[in-house]
């Protein structure tokens, strides 16, 4: 996914943004691939490495609470983080546990975005097996870490546009 905008102008806009990446670290190898793609995407678009903070949650279920905590942090009345990217993997097993975890994680992440009006994107892979997971963590289906990060970057632009539009 390539967002069409002036990359030179975008570097100025993004260079001062502070981003939190939350990694539900249950599947370490998979999550490492998601995290690396996310970090590379952020730096490619001008976000400085020292403005990217990575937080590790034990699993996907814990991501929304950590996202809410990070979204609520402020300095001098302004949000500490301009955007949050949630990454992880949940693989279907033999019980309904998969549905509960996936639904609550997705709902919780979206609620953070709505409540705090901070772009908070969902890069948690939810698949039926490890083969599908690998395919979406840098394999032939792309990398959900990169995709979620691009969605967050695009939302940063759109939120700024929405704030500055005059009708």
From Swiss-Prot:
<comment type="similarity">
    <text>Belongs to the DMRL synthase family.</text>
</comment>
<feature type="binding site">
    <location>
        <begin position="94"/>
        <end position="95"/>
    </location>
    <ligand>
        <name>(2S)-2-hydroxy-3-oxobutyl phosphate</name>
    </ligand>
</feature>
<feature type="binding site">
    <location>
        <begin position="89"/>
        <end position="91"/>
    </location>
    <ligand>
        <name>5-amino-6-(D-ribitylamino)uracil</name>
    </ligand>
</feature>
<dbReference type="GO" id="GO:0009349">
    <property type="term" value="C:riboflavin synthase complex"/>
</dbReference>
<feature type="binding site">
    <location>
        <position position="136"/>
    </location>
    <ligand>
        <name>(2S)-2-hydroxy-3-oxobutyl phosphate</name>
    </ligand>
</feature>
<feature type="binding site">
    <location>
        <begin position="60"/>
        <end position="62"/>
    </location>
    <ligand>
        <name>5-amino-6-(D-ribitylamino)uracil</name>
    </ligand>
</feature>
<dbReference type="InterPro" id="IPR036467">
    <property type="entry name" value="LS/RS_sf"/>
</dbReference>
<dbReference type="GO" id="GO:0009231">
    <property type="term" value="P:riboflavin biosynthetic process"/>
</dbReference>
<dbReference type="GO" id="GO:0005829">
    <property type="term" value="C:cytosol"/>
</dbReference>
<dbReference type="InterPro" id="IPR002180">
    <property type="entry name" value="LS/RS"/>
</dbReference>
<comment type="subunit">
    <text>Forms an icosahedral capsid composed of 60 subunits, arranged as a dodecamer of pentamers.</text>
</comment>
<dbReference type="GO" id="GO:0000906">
    <property type="term" value="F:6,7-dimethyl-8-ribityllumazine synthase activity"/>
</dbReference>
<dbReference type="Pfam" id="PF00885">
    <property type="entry name" value="DMRL_synthase"/>
</dbReference>
<feature type="binding site">
    <location>
        <position position="122"/>
    </location>
    <ligand>
        <name>5-amino-6-(D-ribitylamino)uracil</name>
    </ligand>
</feature>
<keyword id="KW-0686">Riboflavin biosynthesis</keyword>
<feature type="binding site">
    <location>
        <position position="26"/>
    </location>
    <ligand>
        <name>5-amino-6-(D-ribitylamino)uracil</name>
    </ligand>
</feature>
<dbReference type="InterPro" id="IPR034964">
    <property type="entry name" value="LS"/>
</dbReference>
<comment type="pathway">
    <text>Cofactor biosynthesis; riboflavin biosynthesis; riboflavin from 2-hydroxy-3-oxobutyl phosphate and 5-amino-6-(D-ribitylamino)uracil: step 1/2.</text>
</comment>
<comment type="function">
    <text>Catalyzes the formation of 6,7-dimethyl-8-ribityllumazine by condensation of 5-amino-6-(D-ribitylamino)uracil with 3,4-dihydroxy-2-butanone 4-phosphate. This is the penultimate step in the biosynthesis of riboflavin.</text>
</comment>
<keyword id="KW-0808">Transferase</keyword>
<feature type="active site" description="Proton donor">
    <location>
        <position position="97"/>
    </location>
</feature>
<protein>
    <recommendedName>
        <fullName>6,7-dimethyl-8-ribityllumazine synthase</fullName>
        <ecNumber>2.5.1.78</ecNumber>
    </recommendedName>
</protein>
